[in-house]
Amino acid sequence: VGSEMCIRDSAEKFAKLANGLVEQFSAVEIMPASGSQPALMGNGQYTLGENIADQGGLRIGYTAFLNSQRKKGVDVDSQEALIDGFTPAQAFYLNFANLWAQNIRPEEMRRLTVGDVHSLGENRVNVSLRNIAPFFKAFGIKQGDKMWRPAEEQVIIW
């Protein structure tokens, strides 16, 4: 009985957190309304599994990156650790953003939004990183900045 209750409680907590990601990605306007066409919004429910994977991957990847730097004896907060003028943390997140950089036509944006279980690259970066506190620290993001999201609105699943 106790384990069933624990499983049910865990499932409810997971569903609540997952719904938070659904709402965040569904709130993104992919394409504005045009003529008789309504605005095209992200489909957070359809892309949920991949959005959760991106969140978990970012967290695990960043932890692994920091651990590898420490094992090499690198002080990631030192001036000597700068990479082309960026801190190691900044370089990590910039590389994530570069991975998903794309230039696509509106019709392809529409096709991908409707038929692909992955969010568009821009949203994989911008929505995901707004849930990652170390990203805020790396770039000094604060209230009022475009990428700011209050801690109580950040979704942390894994």
Question: How should each PLM-predicted stretch be described?
Answer:
Residues S3-W158:
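Zinc-dependent metallohydrolase catalytic domains
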